[in-house]
């Protein structure tokens, strides 16, 4: 709701990006939001403004977390709308009449002025968004991988040490979210890395730079909230 308040108080200072499909955007979206489906964001980086607060929003907050992290890597002032439309906006019960149906046009594209290093990062982010891929795995699918061939994957739990100790996915390695960068050398590069947190938000933020670095990193859908909701097993050792 803080993001919504900011958008209402000073709409000209906000650039709201709805990453959902065009069909879902057309059914109703945050007032003022433009539509850039997640898979198309790389092709539309040039429309992102450098002089506004960018708010990325999707369905659950997981793809918007990736998008915001990547935009930050490019120097944009970007944040993710936590929980997305399903778990962030819907619980506020503001009513469908607070949404708008009209499509808001994208601003004109502006080519950035980049040095060699900046161009490398820009190109890497631009290539991050292949069609029909959101880098998220369902809890049941991850459990199948853990049970079938645990040595072929890494499960990375980025919650607090206390919550990890209270119960985690079998074989999961623990590195708290704020410590991942300093300990990235502990994460194997030769196998897929499945990252879990509480609801998928910080996992989304984590996998974005990891994928840019060359990791095959995927976030768990809804994090341990999704895992527990599916009543899947945990261990405490």
What are these regions (language model features)?
Residues 15-20, 36, 142, 154-159, ...:
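Short hydrophobic beta-strand that contains or immediately precedes a catalytic carboxylate
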Residues 1-10, 26-53, 62-140, 145, ...:
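Rhodanese-like catalytic fold shared by cysteine-dependent sulfurtransferases
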Residues 23, 162:
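Conserved alpha-helical interface elements of two-component signaling phosphotransfer modules
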Residues 58, 197:
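Short cysteine clusters
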Residues 11, 150:
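Periplasmic peptidoglycan-binding/tethering modules of Gram-negative envelope proteins
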């Amino acid at each position: 709701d803080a993001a919504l308040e900011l958008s209402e108080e000073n709409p000209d200072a906000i650039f709201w990006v709805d990453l959902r499909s065009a069909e879902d955007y057309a059914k109703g979206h945050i007032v003022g939001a433009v539509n850039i489906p997640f898979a198309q964001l790389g092709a539309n980086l040039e429309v992102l403004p450098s002089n506004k607060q960018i708010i990325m929003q999707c369905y659950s907050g997981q793809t918007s977390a990736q998008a915001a992290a990547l935009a930050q890597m490019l120097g944009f002032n970007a944040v993710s709308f936590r929980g997305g439309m399903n778990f962030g906006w819907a619980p506020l019960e503001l009513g469908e009449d607070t949404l708008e149906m009209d499509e808001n046009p994208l601003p004109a594209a502006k080519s950035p002025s980049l040095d060699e290093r900046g161009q490398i990062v820009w190109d890497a982010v631009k290539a991050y968004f292949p069609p029909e891929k959101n880098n998220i795995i369902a809890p049941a699918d991850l459990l199948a991988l853990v049970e079938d061939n645990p040595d072929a994957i890494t499960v990375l739990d980025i919650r607090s040490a206390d919550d990890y100790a209270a119960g985690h996915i079998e074989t999961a390695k623990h590195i708290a979210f704020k410590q991942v960068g300093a300990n990235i050398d502990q994460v194997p590069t030769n196998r897929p890395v499945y990252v879990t947190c509480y609801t998928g938000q910080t996992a989304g933020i984590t996998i974005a730079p990891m994928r840019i670095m060359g990791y095959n990193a995927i976030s768990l859908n809804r994090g341990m909230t999704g895992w527990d909701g599916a009543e899947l097993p945990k261990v405490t050792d």
